[in-house]
């Protein structure tokens, strides 16, 4: 687990304004460095580069980069709208954080500022004869960088905002989150298995804010209890919706004290959920993409089938990286592990419900559950069996012809082979 300031710094790096500002500062410094190093250029070389040559190139760069930046921003906004409409609004955040798009826009803005500062300094006579040579060389390097960026941008535009590309971004973010959680099942804390009721001898701590828990600073939370015999039982995990009427944690031994305020500061609350530290939100977004594809307005079952496959990959990555031995880094903080049945239900249940009338969707759901159940029976078998029967119930009550209904039933009994013979669809 990383500390709060490192997490906030990581989130800042993902912002478009940060990368654009960084590139702009570098561009301005680069343009001004030519003034400092002009003494290194021999006078015999400086006469070969005319002032008009550099000035004309910088003028072309300034005018073209401003137009290209404006055009690229309009494309970016269109891509955001496409992701919101065709995929899900929850996935737009990942499109906004796209590294290639941010680098392209930052390069264009930086090139514009470089040429602008160069023109101003050149007209002021700050470069001199020898400084113009350095400015000319740097300008050629900037032009080469712009050409490479344009080629990358053209290639990237073919997939920006598309359903497949955006879904892949959600899958990648989900896999990273699940692998991190598999390696730290309890966020580094001590497993809290009996989390359905308040532990005896503890006092409830209530939040002052309303919203979703975005991040829990386990490092700071543990440090607050370093020389303290008390323990903390974390109720509100990332993704939980908190309210002043419900406790976010329990503090052992004694009455609620001033430390409660410090404990609450370790929990970052946001208006919306995020992919970091919130595996269930990742699965919910994947399920939402599939459900939107199954809606009558879209009617794209193949996208839903693709999402089911991605969901199986996400859960498989989680199971592959999950260890039976839990490493406890913060023994004074008790955290409940993820419930396997919740994970499967978050993803498969909405898809099975919305795709009840489509034979191919029900078959894919059953096969996906079977793969997870047989691949990691100790993790998914029980939950997969329950959801498979639920899927069969949806199919039985949906408007299927007899042959389709028989096919789905036969696949169910073949894959799950009557593991629960008492249930009758």
Regions picked out by a protein language model, each given a short descriptive name:
Residues 18-24, 189-193:
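Active-site bordering "gate/hinge" segments
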């Amino acid at each position: 687990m990383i500390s709060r300031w490192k997490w906030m710094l990581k989130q800042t790096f993902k912002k478009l304004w940060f990368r654009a500002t960084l590139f702009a500062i570098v561009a301005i410094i680069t343009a001004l460095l030519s003034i400092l190093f002009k003494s290194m250029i021999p006078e015999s070389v400086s006469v070969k580069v005319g002032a008009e040559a550099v000035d004309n190139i910088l003028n072309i760069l300034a005018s073209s980069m401003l137009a290209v930046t404006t055009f690229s921003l309009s494309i970016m906004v269109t891509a955001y709208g496409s992701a919101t409409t065709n995929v899900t609004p929850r996935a737009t955040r990942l499109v906004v954080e796209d590294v290639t798009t941010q680098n392209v826009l930052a390069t264009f803005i930086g090139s514009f500022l470089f040429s602008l500062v160069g023109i101003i300094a050149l007209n002021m006579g700050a470069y001199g004869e020898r400084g113009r040579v350095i400015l000319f060389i740097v300008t050629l390097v900037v032009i080469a960088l712009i050409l490479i960026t344009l080629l990358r941008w053209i290639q990237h535009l073919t997939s920006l905002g598309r359903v497949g590309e955006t879904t892949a971004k959600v899958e990648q973010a989900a896999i990273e989150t699940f692998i991190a959680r598999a390696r730290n099942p309890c966020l580094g804390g001590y497993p809290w298995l009996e989390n359905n009721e308040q532990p005896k001898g503890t006092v409830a701590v209530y939040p002052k804010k309303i919203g979703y828990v975005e991040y829990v600073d386990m490092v700071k939370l543990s440090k607050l209890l370093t020389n303290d015999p008390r323990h903390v039982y974390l109720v509100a995990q990332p993704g939980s919706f908190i309210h002043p009427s419900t406790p976010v944690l329990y503090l052992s031994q004694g009455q609620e004290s001033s430390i409660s305020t410090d404990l609450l500061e370790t929990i970052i609350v946001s208006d919306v959920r995020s992919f970091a530290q919130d595996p269930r939100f990742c699965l919910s977004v994947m399920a939402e993409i599939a459900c939107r594809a199954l809606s009558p307005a879209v009617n794209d079952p193949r996208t839903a089938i693709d999402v089911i496959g991605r969901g199986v990959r996400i859960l498989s990555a989680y199971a592959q990286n999950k260890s039976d031995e839990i490493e406890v880094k913060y023994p004074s903080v008790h955290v409940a592990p993820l419930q396997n049945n919740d994970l499967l239900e978050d993803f498969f249940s909405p898809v099975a419900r919305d795709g009840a009338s489509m034979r191919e969707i029900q078959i894919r759901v059953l096969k996906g559950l079977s793969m997870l159940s047989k691949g990691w029976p100790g993790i998914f078998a029980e939950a997969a069996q329950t959801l498979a029967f639920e899927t069969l119930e949806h199919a039985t009550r949906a408007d299927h012809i007899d042959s389709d209904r028989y096919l789905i039933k036969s696949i169910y009994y073949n894959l799950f082979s009557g593991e629960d013979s008492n249930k009758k669809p």
